[in-house]
From Swiss-Prot:
Binding site for pyridoxal 5'-phosphate: A75, S76, W100, T148, D167, Q190, N233, T234
Modified residues (N6-(pyridoxal phosphate)lysine): K191
Keywords for this protein: Amino-acid biosynthesis, Aminotransferase, Cytoplasm, Pyridoxal phosphate, Pyridoxine biosynthesis, Serine biosynthesis, Transferase
Gene: serC
The keyword rRNA processing belongs to this UniProt entry's keyword annotation: no
Keyword Oxidoreductase attributed: no
Known catalytic reactions: O-phospho-L-serine + 2-oxoglutarate = 3-phosphooxypyruvate + L-glutamate; 4-(phosphooxy)-L-threonine + 2-oxoglutarate = (R)-3-hydroxy-2-oxo-4-phosphooxybutanoate + L-glutamate
Protein name (record): Phosphoserine aminotransferase
Length: 358
């Protein structure tokens, strides 16, 4: 029997995708070989590669103003690639809402970029999304859409006149996005859209001009990958294959509007379980900024019970509920592939646990 996986990433995958990958693992579409065994230069793989890029653009309803790049190195490599490629001679502005924005700020500073932190919620342990106003003349404005550790999420992105950069790693493909002022939108795909080893970057084509005439190593230059259709070097072929299956699955769900509707239902159910517990459970994030993806909470009346909660949950068939080492507590990551019944199972367990130990 499969466990219910609440891991923050790599995370649970739709069972039908796993079964299709299993079916095709040794014999891809009856061809007598695995997708993992063939050259990335073959027509067979190119159909997967370019098909995945087109489906990703279709889900976000993007036109040809945007290039889709498949890169390696995780979202963490983007912390350096973004300032390396997109910083000019001005200020790069960041909103600091958690560990991942702190890491991004650090990488930009290492490169000698003029970084300005225009808003931060660090003083309250990142329990909310701070009000942010970016200037009109920065090289770019940078935010992290969703914060896996602290369970906060932008409900709407800031309106900016300067190019907006969005790290969407943990709410990738979970809702529709207004791209009107987004210059670069990126994430590792291993939470909501595939397996580890692949990052997907949507970059507005005019931003690629910034990479020209810069002394950047070829592998770290966005223009290199755009001009070579993300085939400059051997890409992570199996991760792209899995991403392609995920794109098909999301389209078959009815697109991102339907996916968002289901995600909202799951989150509402879980937050109600916390809020109606008479203080036994307490969420970390301010209610107005709660994440639909990552629900971080404590057993407020007795935090010593939290390891027992995780242990008994595992015995009941639920894994991945231990909170991040920085914040502690309990965290339920309820990404796209988790269904409503699985979240309901967690809520029922939470009520039973409260009944035993309150």
């Amino acid at each position: 029997m499969r466990k219910i996986n609440f891991s923050a990433g790599p995370s649970t995958l739709p069972l039908e995708i796993l079964e299709q990958a299993q079916k095709e693992l040794c014999d891809y579409q009856g061809r007598g070989y695995s997708i993992m065994e063939i050259s990335h230069r073959t027509k067979v793989f190119e159909e997967v590669h370019f098909g995945a890029q087109e489906k990703a653009k279709k889900l976000y309803e993007l036109n040809d103003d945007y290039e889709v790049l498949f890169l390696q190195g995780g979202a963490s490599l983007q912390f350096a690639m973004i300032p390396m490629n997109l910083a000019l001679n001005g200020v790069c502005e960041y909103a600091n809402t958690g560990v991942w924005t702190k890491k991004a700020i650090k990488e930009a500073q290492i490169l000698g970029v003029n970084v300005k932190t225009v808003a931060s919620s660090e003083e309250s342990n990142f329990d909310h999304i701070p009000r942010v106003e970016f200037s009109d003349n920065a090289d770019y404005a940078y935010i992290c859409s969703n914060n896996t550790i602290y369970g906060t999420q932008y409900q709407n992105y800031p309106k900016t006149k300067t190019p907006l950069i969005v790290d969407a790693s943990s709410d990738f493909f979970s809702r529709k996005v207004d791209f009107s002022n987004i210059a670069l939108f990126y994430g590792g795909v291993q939470k909501n859209a595939g397996i580890s080893g692949l990052s997907c970057i949507f970059i507005r084509k005019d931003m690629l001009e910034r990479s020209k005439n810069k002394q950047i190593p070829s592998m770290l230059n966005y223009l290199t990958h755009a001009e070579n259709q993300s085939l400059f070097n051997t890409p992570p072929t199996f991760a792209i294959y899995m991403f392609n299956l995920e794109m098909d699955w999301l389209l078959n769900q009815g697109g991102l509007d339907k996916v968002h509707e289901k995600n909202s239902q799951k989150a509402t159910m879980l937050y109600e379980c916390i809020d109606l517990s008479n203080g036994f459970y307490k969420g970390h994030a301010d209610k107005k900024d709660r994440s639909l993806m990552n629900v971080s909470f404590n057993i407020a009346k007795n935090k010593d019970l939290e390891p027992l909660f995780v242990k008994e949950a595992e015995e009941a068939g639920m894994i991945g509920l231990k909170g991040h080492r920085i914040l502690g507590g309990i965290r339920a990551s309820i990404y796209n592939a988790l269904n409503l019944d699985q979240v309901k199972t967690l809520c029922e367990f939470m009520k039973e646990f409260q009944g035993k130990y309150a």
